Amino acid sequence: MASATSAIPAVRAHLLELQRNLAASANVIMDGRDIGTCILPDADVKIFLTASTSVRAMRRYRELQEKGMMCNLEEIEQDIIERDARDMNRETAPLKQAEDAMLLDSSDMTLEQVVQAILEAAFSRGLAPGSQKASDHADSEAGQTKEEV
């Protein structure tokens, strides 16, 4: 649903403005299929998080099962394949890895391992919880934070 809705140009333009305004006003962590390429192309840390379609389908299947929802694993996997194809081939902001994004394939990783890998990527770029990069210190003293995480 989100994929189809975000393909509407007016919706995309409005969301783009909202997301950029949010990032300009505070340190943020954003998740989305075009955050690193379109929304925040100058973000300090970009992670292109992926997993095989079968693993993603199984994760979604388990999530739905835990909520007590009836679902079919094969249909879920087909939906994921179709969404990926639609997003990779859309005219506006197609799904792709940003050139400066770290590729993180979580197919064989636990949630804790994924979090650790992302934290290590942030730390390697000089970011730490509750702090700002030294280059942004002067701006933050004036109440303006330009860091985008």
Where are these regions (language model features)?
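Active-site pocket-lining segment
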Residues: 44, 51-55, 59-61
